[in-house]
């Protein structure tokens, strides 16, 4: 039996490479016959896809060559993936879930992203005990870590990078800002800008929800309206938007566009002269420049997570050794600890 993870993050691959890896990993979700053949009848997987990482956590009872196959598929794209199995896999996910492996150390969004990835996977397909246990314990230990360890508020945030970028391009608090999607990142950016005095904040979401901002219906959305700044954060592609084109985006001179989606909402061979288009690679580079040695102050916290991972790994080994083979694969866990 093998339990492991293969993936890449902002450290190993640029945005273009991460997009290609995400498309390859999504093939496992799109083709159940292919994934069953790849992982075996008793195997399965969970995809963790965020702005800064693309990972596949897998379990297989029979195929011990899965790791090498995954590494080969990802490496063929020019990326340099990492891989962990067993205890190292536990330690990695625990560190990821705690936020200690994030671009901005200690950020909290990753806990929710891991939770949603797990819920999606167990809703879409049967998961074996190993993956249920791994993700339940990672979520529990990540939550415990945040409650027991005092983490200083990040000096550098994505919100601060956005604010500085708007200042750099001459935007003011009177400008009109459009947020596509009521996503977590858009909400954080809007909250930060609102605190800085920005008042013309408008959201456009597919969902009909009550929010503390002005809204525009999707049916009434026009990119030719005088929005000075547009934030794409809805996990949609360009084809999902009526009237979205390079021409419509460039219809407002000096417009600044942030594309937080990975894969990107749209890709441009070169940025037009009349508008400024910025993606997550730009955000990552700006954050890393400001942080310099970004993980220097977090090393002291890692033994805490390593100890928690070892404890849960030992529990997993004991439990899995007593589970009949007929119960290795289960569609519903007995206990969900979030």
From Swiss-Prot:
Q: Quote the Gene3D superfamilies the UniProt record gives.
A: Glutamyl-tRNA reductase, N-terminal domain (3.30.460.30)
| SUBUNIT field | Homodimer.
Natural source organism: Chlamydia abortus (strain DSM 27085 / S26/3) (Chlamydophila abortus)
Q: Domain text from the record?
A: Possesses an unusual extended V-shaped dimeric structure with each monomer consisting of three distinct domains arranged along a curved 'spinal' alpha-helix. The N-terminal catalytic domain specifically recognizes the glutamate moiety of the substrate. The second domain is the NADPH-binding domain, and the third C-terminal domain is responsible for dimerization.
NCBIfam families recorded: PRK00676.1
Q: Where does substrate bind?
A: 50-53, 102, 107-109, 113
Cross-referenced InterPro entries, in alphabetical order?
Answer: 4pyrrol_synth_GluRdtase, 4pyrrol_synth_GluRdtase_N, GluRdtase_CS, GluRdtase_N_sf
E.C. no = 1.2.1.70
Q: What does this protein do?
A: Catalyzes the NADPH-dependent reduction of glutamyl-tRNA(Glu) to glutamate 1-semialdehyde (GSA).
- Could you tell me the keywords of this UniProt record? NADP, Oxidoreductase, Porphyrin biosynthesis
Q: In which pathway does it act?
A: Porphyrin-containing compound metabolism; protoporphyrin-IX biosynthesis; 5-aminolevulinate from L-glutamyl-tRNA(Glu): step 1/2
Q: Which family does it belong to?
A: Belongs to the glutamyl-tRNA reductase family.
Per the record, the GO terms for biological process are: protoporphyrinogen IX biosynthetic process
* GO MF assignments: glutamyl-tRNA reductase activity; NADP binding
Q: What is this protein called?
A: Glutamyl-tRNA reductase
**Other remarks in the entry:** During catalysis, the active site Cys acts as a nucleophile attacking the alpha-carbonyl group of tRNA-bound glutamate with the formation of a thioester intermediate between enzyme and glutamate, and the concomitant release of tRNA(Glu). The thioester intermediate is finally reduced by direct hydride transfer from NADPH, to form the product GSA.
Q: Which residues bind NADP(+)?
A: 181-186
Is Zinc found in the keyword set? no
Claim: NADP is one of the keywords in the record: yes
Query: Could you tell me the gene encoding this protein?
Result: hemA
